[in-house]
Regions:
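Hydrophobic alpha-helical segments within soluble ligand-binding/sensing domains
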Residues: 133-158, 250-254, 269-287
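Flexible loop/hinge segments that line or gate small-molecule binding clefts
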Residues: 105-140, 251-259
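Venus flytrap/periplasmic-binding-protein-like
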Residues: 119, 222-223, 233-264, 300-306
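Short beta-strand segments enriched in small/hydrophobic residues
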Residues: 26-55, 132, 158-167
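Periplasmic-binding protein-like
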Residues: 92-103, 119-121, 158-163, 190-191, ...
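Hydrophobic membrane-insertion alpha-helices, especially the h-region
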Residues: 8-25
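Extracytoplasmic "Venus flytrap"
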Residues: 40-57, 62, 71-81
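Hinge/cleft segment of the Venus flytrap/periplasmic-binding protein
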Residues: 9, 273-319
């Protein structure tokens, strides 16, 4: 039999085990190291975030993996550089750890003095970008798309460029600079259709007999391309007169029009990876790790490419 002292020892042993269990389960002994949650603000150049769907998915994945809290901020007035720079100041004052900015005007924004890391989504070439920036070379993208147009369309088909000079971003400007250079070198006829002149242009295309002389339409950005595709899809006469509709962008509306054959071809970049890399570079900057500019590739795709596994994964990333 166990004596009185033995029973006491057993009780004390059990009590010690319970206490040790409680201490471990409440982190009183084994404490998990606390990781800092980085506050990162992403300020884009637009008034809405529709065009940043895949970008945001990549951004959210990086935030989850790298212990960051990311907030996407839009402008009240599209392409308002003063508002964007004021927002940068506001976020810094509010304690944001780092900024990711899609600049309205690259030169002004890049020259702005900040005390926190700023990752820029540059629209120019890599040589013009600093460490940590993510670059999509829109001039090269425009050149690439123009070469595809020249390859696919007969030499006597005129190219009409839909553009909005008053609301043109650096991305739009560089994209058209690239396409213009290729068309000019090839001696291809290019005419501008300015914002506000589209209705008259489409009315002309609807006139009887115009379908005999096909035209090619090139849109400078996603919004203009979506609008043009809506017109082509809604008018049989315009559709008959348009030999090809081209542009850039990866919104669901654009991809649906491409799948339907309304849009002939688009240039795209991996926007999911752009979002991911931008957050990654912001965290690297905060942790003092070295980084170099990340240069993104551009790709030309048409309807058949939507079923290509590589492009499908890029255009329709799983959240």
């Amino acid at each position: 039999m166990i004596g009185r002292s033995g029973k006491v020892m057993i009780v004390l042993y059990i009590v010690c085990l319970v206490v040790l269990f409680l201490m471990c389960s409440t982190d009183l002994i084994i404490r998990e190291p606390e990781r800092q949650i980085y506050q990162i603000a992403v300020i884009i150049e637009d008034v809405r975030s529709d065009n940043y769907s895949n970008f945001r998915k990549g951004m959210d994945l990086a935030a989850a993996e790298l212990n960051a809290d990311v907030q996407l901020i839009t402008l009240y007035e599209k392409l308002d550089v003063k508002e964007q720079m004021d927002l940068m100041d506001r976020e810094q004052q509010d304690g944001t750890d780092a900024l990711i900015v899609v600049p309205v005007e690259e030169e002004q924004v890049s020259a702005k003095q900040m005390t926190i890391p700023v990752i820029l989504m540059r629209a120019g070439v890599a040589e013009a970008a600093g460490a940590g920036n993510v670059i999509v070379d829109y001039e090269k993208m425009g050149e690439q798309l123009a070469r595809e147009i020249l390859k696919e369309q007969p030499a006597d088909v005129p190219v009409y460029v839909l553009t909005d000079p008053a609301g043109q971003s650096d991305m739009d400007r560089l994209f058209l600079k690239g396409s213009d250079a290729v068309c000019q070198e090839a001696g291809r006829s290019v005419q501008r259709i300015l914002r506000g002149e589209e209705e008259r242009f489409y009315t002309t295309l609807e006139q009887p007999g115009t379908e005999a002389q096909k035209v090619v339409i090139l849109a400078e950005n996603q919004d203009i391309l979506t609008e043009a595709a809506g017109v082509v899809a809604g008018s049989e006469a315009v559709a008959d007169a348009v030999g090809g509709l081209y542009g850039r962008g990866t919104t669901m509306a654009i991809l649906n029009y491409l799948d339907r054959g309304v849009i002939t071809g688009i240039c795209v970049t991996d926007e999911f990876s752009v979002g991911y890399y931008s957050v990654r570079e912001a965290v690297r900057a905060l942790e003092g790790a070295g980084s170099v500019p990340t240069v993104m590739e551009s790709y030309y795709i048409d309807k058949k490419d939507l079923r290509d596994p590589a492009f499908e994964k890029m255009l329709f990333p799983i959240e």
